[in-house]
Amino acid sequence: MAAVVAASRSLAKCWLRPAVRAWPAACQTHARNFHFTVDGKKNASTKVSDSISTQYPVVDHEFDAVVVGAGGAGLRAAFGLSEAGFNTACVTKLFPTRSHTVAAQGGINAALGNMEDDNWRWHFYDTVKGSDWLGDQDAIHYMTEQAPAAVIELENYGMPFSRTEEGKIYQRAFGGQSLQFGKGGQAHRCCCVADRTGHSLLHTLYGRSLRYDTSYFVEYFALDLLMENGECRGVIALCIEDGTIHRFRAKNTVIATGGYGRTYFSCTSAHTSTGDGTAMVTRAGLPCQDLEFVQFHPTGIYGAGCLITEGCRGEGGILINSQGERFMERYAPVAKDLASRDVVSRSMTIEIREGRGCGPEKDHVYLQLHHLPPQQLATRLPGISETAMIFAGVDVTKEPIPVLPTVHYNMGGIPTNYKGQVITHVNGEDKVVPGLYACGEAASASVHGANRLGANSLLDLVVFGRACALTIAETCKPGEPVPSIKPNAGEESVANLDKLRFADGTIRTSEARLNMQKTMQSHAAVFRTGSILQEGCEKLSQIYCDLAHLKTFDRGIVWNTDLVETLELQNLMLCALQTIYGAEARKESRGAHAREDYKFRIDDFDYSKPLQGQQKRPFEEHWRKHTLSYVDVKSGKVTLKYRPVIDRTLNEEDCSSVPPAIRSY
């Protein structure tokens, strides 16, 4: 492969337009050396082709499977495939340990029963309830049943969980978690590594991945899926380091690219959380699901947006208003500060609106931790103590942290079944897209429904990353012939890249991105109303049209971050459009989607009353259904369709489904 890379770089002068100088000598040296293979394996199928463009020759690769993304879900899928004998490529725009999984703090849920008796069926119940009955119960069944084994697997990989005095994995309380189907009090189900669980999990999975012969393509930006006759046959990507274009042809493609939190101005997401996989699926003409459901984490640091883990409240922290009241007792009398995230975020917003906010502007509340023993803060929340001092100037042992709800997670994503297979909905039935899988925050299985429970996201990563690998291993064999692609496959992607590289309009990428983020922040926030959402739809549609007038400044091809950020903006815009149009269309309040003009859930039955004598509402007249959104990429027009929620479990005798009810904490 090194020879191929050298050959592709020698073609650089052929690619560059006359107005652009040849690459400097420093850029023509060998690739940086890592302690694992980053450029793929040498094989007979790897070759340079000019079938798309003489200016942009393409390096072709052939694999059994390609995984896009190397966070928790991507790594688990990639080494699961390699372990099963598949020739696997992992394409990632970041070095694996820079993926956003590293930022997760609180923990990973599993009914281990280390603190009190627990049962995965209780975890199942809490997750269904937390989803506000929009979650698919077959997928939730699969995830919660697999959870204990997934955590033990991580422990066996060497993940250094916090421990009890008896040496068991320590489990803390987290929001929305109960015992005995909501009747037995607060559950302690969240396994953690102090308050740096995501960091530990990602490094554990990365270390494990080095055991296997996976080909890592690091700092390669995935541009688009390679689709033929409704099947996915790989991806096309840009090597950021040297500007080469690469086509990865594979029988199986797994998308694990994370969320799109950067559609908002204030969020806990990394700057690289740009919905790349979600947008690739959209451009392929496939639907995305439930993008209107965006989780606002209750405790982002005021003015900075940095995450303060729910584990703070799990360890005994409380939220207070300007009057010193523990106000969550009013909104969730039983769970109080450990109600689900959507409930806490709305409660905080109401306190601020009604004039009980803190600070000179009365525009935030306080998270109080200084009543807890300093030793507990030092051992269980060391990262938070440091973060609060750096970003808020607060010593948590002496004063409270100013906090405000901040965009944190996308419940929606690429629709999949519980096996990780991407699906569409045709003529009233779910249809699998051959060769395409998704997992992690990029996917919508849908285990989170309208609202995710804290510490279910890391569980989602490892369970469904593994599920993708298992499904591929069940349906394919290593070394099977890889389907062919057209000689010019990917030419539209390269044409778009070339257009952006030489874009000479009037609007900077940063300006358009800021307009999008501020529109989303002000028009699709914790509380939403029809008129504001409609205005937001109009504004975003105009911003989407403005993308035709972008101006980029770097005309080079080597490490052109201006170009990469513009490609990411295109991806963000597709996600933002589907989010706000889906929110405007959904005329109800459910989970994280709270409409002030439609304050209640609209289900197939009125679950606030006895069901006897009620007639089921027609599918068109209720909202307990998944949104499927499509975008015409040329015009930006959004089309919405809907599919039913799956209420059955994988085995009703083993785990009974949970019928909808009024949701309270």
Swiss-Prot record:
Superkingdom, natural source: Eukaryota
Binding site for oxaloacetate: H297, T309, H408, R452, A455
EC number: 1.3.5.1, 1.1.5.-
One protein family per Pfam: FAD_binding_2
InterPro entries found in the cross-reference section: FAD-dep_OxRdtase_2_FAD-bd, FAD/NAD-bd_sf, FRD_SDH_FAD_BS, Fum_R/Succ_DH_flav-like_C_sf, Fum_Rdtase/Succ_DH_flav-like_C, SdhA/FrdA/AprA, Succ_DH/fumarate_Rdtase_cat_sf, Succ_DH_flav_su_fwd
Residues annotated as transit peptide in the record: 1-44
PROSITE patterns the record matches: FRD_SDH_FAD_BINDING
A molecular-function term among this protein's GO annotations: succinate dehydrogenase (quinone) activity
Cofactor requirement: FAD
Keywords carried by this UniProt record: Electron transport, FAD, Flavoprotein, Membrane, Mitochondrion, Mitochondrion inner membrane, Oxidoreductase, Transit peptide, Transport, Tricarboxylic acid cycle
Chemical reaction(s) catalysed: a ubiquinone + succinate = a ubiquinol + fumarate; (R)-malate + a quinone = enol-oxaloacetate + a quinol; (S)-malate + a quinone = enol-oxaloacetate + a quinol
Membrane topology classification: Peripheral membrane protein
Annotated residues for binding of FAD: A70, A73, T92, K93, S99, T101, G106, A222, D276, E441, S457, L458
Main location: mitochondrion
Annotated positions of the Tele-8alpha-FAD histidine modification: H100
Protein's pathway: Carbohydrate metabolism; tricarboxylic acid cycle; fumarate from succinate (eukaryal route): step 1/1
NCBIfam families referenced in this protein's UniProt entry, alphabetically: sdhA_forward (TIGR01816), sdhA_frdA_Gneg (TIGR01812)
Function: Flavoprotein (FP) subunit of succinate dehydrogenase (SDH) that is involved in complex II of the mitochondrial electron transport chain and is responsible for transferring electrons from succinate to ubiquinone (coenzyme Q). SDH also oxidizes malate to the non-canonical enol form of oxaloacetate, enol-oxaloacetate. Enol-oxaloacetate, which is a potent inhibitor of the succinate dehydrogenase activity, is further isomerized into keto-oxaloacetate.
Homology family: Belongs to the FAD-dependent oxidoreductase 2 family. FRD/SDH subfamily.
Subunit structure: Component of complex II composed of four subunits: the flavoprotein (FP) SDHA, iron-sulfur protein (IP) SDHB, and a cytochrome b560 composed of SDHC and SDHD.
Protein name in the entry: Succinate dehydrogenase [ubiquinone] flavoprotein subunit, mitochondrial
Species in which this protein is naturally found: Gallus gallus
Lineage of producing organism: Eukaryota, Metazoa, Chordata, Craniata, Vertebrata
